Amino acid sequence: MISSRQDQTGAPLSSSTTTTTPVVAPISVVDHGLPYDTHNLYDVSFNNTHTIYTLLTSDPSLVDSWISTVLRDHQQRVLTVGLDIEWRPNTQRNMQNPVATLQLCVAERCLVFQILHSPSIPPSLVSFLADPNITFVGVGIQEDVEKLLEDYNLNVANVRDLRSFAAERLGDLELKRAGLKSLGLRVLGLEVAKPKRVTRSRWDNPWLTAQQVQYAAVDAFLSYEIDRRLSSYN
């Protein structure tokens, strides 16, 4: 029998490896199919408990609007943002493909910015990422922000790696080597499918498939949600 810790909602935070069968989180996506070249909207259902409202776009003005809405809605609160990136898999030696998409998630609102196909990077995004009062969270996030800096000269000022955060909160140094899938299982008690056919797909395509958007949104949402759960533990 294992001992368990609880967050402020009473949900368990296991401090050792669970022996129960993991719950596979059901995930589905609704494609709104908007008749625009600039963007599309998706509703990603996660575990039948969350709907991740997702904007896919390469339009700088829509990125402006998304950021403005987030800042307006969270102006009186500490802002934490799940961050992830995707790029076309590198298939040639000594060739590194640039970041194709930047995913940002706050609560159930997610942006999938096709930065590779954007005519410009909006100043609002530059300021948002460089704001030291905003904490961007993810697994291996330091490598992600270094790639953003190398590929687009984007500086992310304040980051928190969920591996170290989970290791500290749960008192398990092994978690410093965990991936996002492992942390989702450990912290949220949910197994999240990450099919390789999507992981290694063409993220540089001008239009992503609904499955790619679902994958991208869930990754950023998981980062946000894992951090929220760990932060609520006392």
Please provide the spans of the model-predicted regions.
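N-terminal accessory regions of nucleic-acid-interacting proteins
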Residues: 1-79, 162
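Conserved DEDDh/DEDDy metal-dependent 3′-5′ exonuclease domain
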Residues: 52-64, 78-80, 89-210, 214, ...
